[in-house]
Amino acid sequence: MRQNEIDRRTKEDIIAYVKEISGQYTPEWRMNEENPDFGTALVYLYADMFADTIKKFNYSLERNRIAFFNELSASLLPAIPAKGFITFGLPPQMESGTQVPRHTQLLANKVDDDGMNLIFETMDDIFATPAKLTDMYVSNGTQDTIHQIYSTEEEALPITPFFLYDKCGENLQKHEFIIYHPYVFYIKGAGQIKITLVPSETNEISDAIMNAFTDPKNVVFSYLTDIGFVPFTNVKCENNTLILNKKSQSKAFWKQEESNYFQIKCEIKEVHIFENLELQNIMLGTKAHKISPEVIISGDSEQDKSEFFPFGESPSIYDEVYFSSNEVFQKKDARISIQFDLDFLKIPIDMDETEITIDWKVIMKKKDFKLDKEYDITIDQVIWEYYNGLGWSRLFPGPEYEDIFSTANGMKGQRKRMEFICPENIEKALVQADESYCIRAKILKIKNAYKINGFYITPLISEVKLSYDYTGHEQSPKLLEMFHNMQVKQYNDIDLNNSREFPLVETLEGNNFIWYLGFDRAPVDGPIKMLCNLYDTAKHKMPELIWEYYTLQGWKNMNVIDETENFRKTGLVTWIGNHDFIEKNIFRKTRYWIRIQDIENTYGMYHTRFIPRIDDICLNTTKIIHLQNKEGELLFVEQPTEFLTLSLMNTKVCWIQVWVNETNNLSLSEIDKLTENKRLDIVYSDNGVIESIWVKWEEVSDFSLSNGKSRHYLIDRNEGVLHFSDGIHGAIPPKGQQETIKVNYTFGGGEEGNLEINQIQMLNASVGFISTVTNPTKTYGGCDVENIYDSFKRNAETLTHRNRCVTRTDYEEISKAACRNIVKVKCFSGKNQDGEEEKGAITLVVLPNDYQSCNNSFEDIQEKLFAYLPKCMDSNIVGLGKLYVTKPHFLEIRIRAEIVVKDFNDVFGIKEDLNDALERFLDPISGNFNEMGWGIGKIPTHNQIMSIMKGIKGIEFIGNTFIDHYVDGRFGLMEVSIDKINTVYMLPKSGKHDLIFSVKKA
C-alpha cells in the first residue's frame, strides 16, 4: 500500500522547473548540466532540500495517522505460526515403540534470514508404535459386498485415495462351496452326477429351495477341467437330490496334481434364498453307461476293442485278459457292469505229421486208415481278479461268472452281462507298460486241455461296454470347502458322517457398512495417533461412527479422540491401545483388527450428501507448529520503577506466561485466593520449607481498567518487550536479590513456515529409536507480522464496526481481522451453507490465501471464525446454529475456439499470449478487467471472455467459440450447464483451453 501524497513533485521535477524559469529571471545565465557552474550546483542543492521537504510534508498525514492509532493503543498483529503434521518412522523389525514428548523440535530443510534451519515443535505427546497398517477392507452386510481398499505385506506402499465406504473395485464376497473327491467325479464322456443334500434334524428343504438350485440365476454348478471350471448346462432336482448332467462332448474332469481330487463347485448368487438352510451331510453319486474300455490286453499284446479273442485263438490254462478303464474301475463301492457280445469260433488244432501213427503198407485195409477221435477244447472256468496294491485278489467271493466263457449255454452269439461292487481297496496295476485301474479274467480250467486232435472252441468278444452307478452306494465328500466372507471352512468325511451340522451360506456380520483396518502388530500403549488426510471438508455433520477392536471376548468399543469429526475433515484419531488385542483371521488375513462401523447405516441408505474422500492415512503422526518453546527465562528487577520495560531474549512472541516472585509480599488471604484461581506456584526446599512463591500475572490490552493492586502487564509480541504500569493503574513488580520475574513463552511464526511436503526431515536431537521424520502434508497458515498499511485499514474498519457484526461488511471485515489467512470473504444473509434460502441464516464464504496448494488451511480458518465471531454477533444466530462458514466452489472454465491468424509463424506466439491472457483474466484473485479478481458469485460472461480474446495482437478472426464449465464431482471434474447450477458461492478459474489455429487465405 502506498501512502497518500499531497505533493507528488520529485527532485527531477524541481530541477526541470528551475531550468524552465531561469531564462526569465536570469537571461544571462544558462544551466549547463554537462559543465556545471556554481549556479547549477546551487540548483541541485536546492532541489535536494526541497524534495526532502516535500517528502516530510507528504509523510505528515501518515505520521498523524500513526499518532492517532497509537493513542487508541492500536498495534500490529503478530506473526502467525504455520501448522502441519509430522510422521515418525521406526527402523524395520523394531519390536518396541518410542515415546516422543511434546515440544520435540524438528528441523526443516528451509533456512530463515539468519541462515538457520526453521524449527518446528510437536504440539502433543505421541507414542510411535512399531505396528504397521497393512490391510483395509470395507464390507456391507445388506449389500453382501467386500471390497479391498489397501493391502501390503513387507514395504509400506502409498494409499490410493478412496471414498469412505465406497464400493470400489471387485466385490470379493463369494458364497460357494467346493466338493472334493478322488474318484467319484471322474467322468470322461457323458454321465450323470447326483448330489443329495441331507438337512439337519431341525431343518427341511422345501421344493422351492430345491428348484432354486436349478436356476442358474441363483446357483451355478461347475466342475474343474484342465482349462478351469466349466459350468453344467443341465441341472435338475428330484426330492433332495440335484442331478447334474454332463454331455459327451464336454471336457473331462481334471484332477490337480497337488490336491489329487476332482472338484465340483457350487457358486451361490442369490444368498437370501438359502440363508436359513442347514445341512449335516452331502452325499455324492455318479452314473454313466456304455463306456468302452481304455485298453484290453491279452497275450502280452493290446487287442482291437471292436472284436478280439480274449485268450487268443488257442487258449490254455492261466491265460489272462485285462480290461482297463481308469474312469470305471476306480469307482470304489459303485455298482459296475460289463456287457459284451460273445461268440465262439471253431479253430482246428495244428497237428504235427510225425504224431500220426498210421502203419503204412503196400496193401492196406480200410480199418488201417482210421484216425484218432477229434475233441472240442473249451474253457470251463475262469477267475475274475483285481489288484489291491499288494497282489491280485478275487473279484467275487463265490463262483459268480466263472463259466461266462463256457459253451454250456450254446455256441451261438450271446449278450453277456456281469455286475459287481467295485472293491474299496482296488489300486492301479502295472500291465506291460501301462499302469491303470483294471480287472482281469484268468483261465482256471479247460475241457480237453491236453487233446491233440480236434478244435479250439475259442471265445470271440465284441462290443464291450462298461457302466457304473452309485445308486444305493452314495459317498460322502472327502473334503468340503465352504467359502463365505472371504473365509474358508473345511469339513472332511469324518465330520460329515458324524452329522456335524453346518449352514449352507454365511452372511456378513451386521447390516451396515464396516471399515476394517488390519495391523501386523497390536497397536497398544499410547497415545497412538493416526492422521486421516481428507481431500475436502464436509459442510454438514457426518453420521456417527463407532470404533471397535478385536479381543478374546469379541469386538469391544474403542475409546478414541476423533478430531476428524467422523471424517468430516482432516484430523488425527488418537487412542491408547489396550493389551487385550488379539489376532483374528478376517478376509484371509491374520491381523490385529480395528473396525469402524456406520452404526446407523446412513451411508448404506445414501442419505449423506457428502462422501468423504480419504487421500492418505498416516500412523505415528502428530501436529506440529512453527514455534519454539522457552520455559523459565528469568528477568531481574534492580529497582521498582514506573512503566518498567523488560526485553525478552526472543521476538515474535506467540503465547506467554509471566510469573513474579512475591514471597515476602503476600498475605495468607491472598495466598488462599490465588491458590483457588490456580495462579500460585509454591517452591519448597528438600526440608519442606517454602523457598519462593510465584504469582502468575495477567496480560491485558491496556491499563485503563487496572488499579494499584492489579497484577497486569502488556506485551509487545513483535519486539518481545514486557511493559508494566505505574503502581496506580497496575502494580509494579517487586525487586529482589535474585531474578524476580520468570517468563514461559513460545516464539516464532511467519510465512516462511509454509512448507511443501517432505520438507521437514530432521530431528533437532535424537529421540529414542526414531529413524525417520517427514511432513506428509503441507504446512499452512503461517503469516508474517502485519504491515503498517494493513494495520491502518484494519484499525480504521474497527472504528466503524466496533467489533460488532451488524452489516454484511462488518462480518467480512471482522472475519479478516480474526484470521489473516483470508484472501476473499463475502457474507450472505438468508442463505445457508448450501446456498439455499434459510431465514435468519448468516453464511460467510471464505477463500484462504493458499487455496490452490493446501486444503487444510480452510479447516483452521473455520475453527478460528467459529471461535471468534460469536463474541461479536447476535447470540440468537449462534444459539440457533444459523452461522455458517464455507468455502467457494470453483467453476473451471474451458474455452474451445477457432483462431485465424495471418501467418503460420505467428501461431506459437499468439497461442502463448492467448493462454496467458485467459489465465490472468480468469484468475480469482488478480483477474478481471481491473486486476482486482472476481467477487464470490460473479462468473465471467461470454462477451467478457470474447473481449479479452479479441484484444490479442495478431488475431485476424475468431470463429466458433464454445465455453464449457466444469465443477468438482465425486469422481473428478464433471461438465455442467451454467444456466442450471447455483453459482452464488462460485469463483471462476482457468482450465485447459482447446484453441484450433488456421491461416487466413490470401
Which residue stretches match the model-derived regions?
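Carbohydrate-recognition loop of C-type lectin domains
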Residues: 10-19, 724, 802-932, 936, ...
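Feature for intrinsically disordered/low-complexity regulatory segments and propeptides
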Residues: 44-48, 59-73, 80, 86-89, ...
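Glycine- and acidic
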Residues: 365-370, 530-532, 792-801, 899, ...
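Buried hydrophobic packing residues in well-ordered domains
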Residues: 103, 235, 384, 547, ...
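Extended assembly-interface regions of large multimeric machines
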Residues: 1-652, 659, 664
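Surface-exposed interaction regions enriched in Ser/Thr/Asp/Glu
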Residues: 267-274, 433-454, 587-610, 690-772, ...
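Short flexible coil/turn linkers enriched for glycine and charged/polar residues
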Residues: 79-80, 378, 524, 652, ...
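An aromatic-glycine-centered, glycine-rich loop/turn in mixed alpha/beta architecture
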Residues: 912-1002
